[in-house]
Amino acid sequence: MSKWIHETVGGWTLHLLLPPSYADGGHYPVVYIQDGGAVARACSNLLDHYYRTGRLPEVILVGIEPPNRNDDYTPWPLPALTASFSSFGGHGRAYLHTIIKQLKPHVDSNYRTLSDRANTGIMGCSLGGLISLYAATEFPHVFGKVGALSASMWYEGFLDYMTGQSWSDRSELKLYMYVGSLEGIYKQNIQAHMLDYTRAAVRAILAKGYPADRLNYVEEEGGTHDMLFFAKHFPEALEWLFT
């Protein structure tokens, strides 16, 4: 059975899920997960089943608790969508630098990891998916596996940013993207167009030369923006990224 370990590194709280065979030795790929790894906790039993049945190679999962997700998971500042929510600070690049310069070195030094790009992933849901895609474009030399579940593609300017990237030179990157057909169904703002923005992003990535066999894009009919669907697709994303 997988084992949770909790620790604090430089003021950042980490929740690590070590795979079932970790105590037996060996080195493992690592995936850094936004929102404290909540999506991994929601499907930890299913992950163990995937391990036992050989569907998924064992990996170390590192959930990172965000001090302020509206700041840490956004690439540039934007005003709040509504008066009841806070604005977006746009500290995403600094957050990713913290992962690369502080958290990843700690994990690689204290756990038996495979630390190269091909064995290092980053994943997240919603805004966590957005910052994971941003990591794919800004730091492809660090993160070779990227999973974006229901990424907040509505974020103003991000689709244009994605379209402006040179995806043909990122052929060593492996990318998984998921979205549900009913994302944003009850929203009255830009979030209502979540599905359209995600589809447009996928078209842009492929049009800019990214190899189609390196991108797994999944839509679920009836899928909404909640943990039920995030947790369902998280193990499938890991399976595709690491097999």
Where are these regions (language model features)?
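Non-catalytic cap/lid and distal C-terminal segments of serine-dependent acyl enzymes
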Residues: 1-243
